[in-house]
């Protein structure tokens, strides 16, 4: 079954044991091995080994000694995967986003690459004593790839967050209830394109208003219960592939004027509306082209000023 659902994606690799040409290790989502030169395979990842494997070191001097790097960190085995040690001393979590609420003490929220969304008090003291007390100060509130987090400033128990490709929900931390808020295209309409890190934004002017980016900008005035698409396609259009392209990557609402909204896309487009989405203008024509708009921040002092960051590392442009 390990082969059936696996794919290479960008991290799939194959290794051959340096001392045994019939011993093969291959990995992508699972970590599997063969003892007969690839005729048969079996899984060697165990319950404490995270999926999505990126690297493997095979000890040339000690058969069965492996060090595995995966989306959950580092695991070590001395018996060829029968038992694994989880290396918890290596801090390798990668945050996609961070936010805070207004409680006292305030909580910090973080969306982590393939390790979900976590929250905890800002004054939590890092300590391994929780292993004895059982009281870990940080709490997981969502799984998958943890993406953006928006907290209702009127009620900090209401949190909007989600995982990859735009699967966001409205969480009630007090009751544990969760409701999907993802916009859905109409019958006969082309499906929306959602970025891996789909942007969302709660309005600072009205916390019932939520903005959601696909290749369009969507607006809800009832906390994500219903949606209105308030723009045309704000990208250059999609491209064929297994990962959506031509998608919005960032949204910024002016803290001065609720009708002024900016969007940025993965293909370098920055748009502005000054009338709440009735009309839009491309303001990126004089910028370097085809770069990823990584973040937009509307000025708190002048509604006509926007701060933008663009990157091109995906095209080796540093």
Question: Where would I find each of the regions flagged by the language model?
Answer:
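Beta-propeller blade termini and top-face loops
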Residues: 1-318
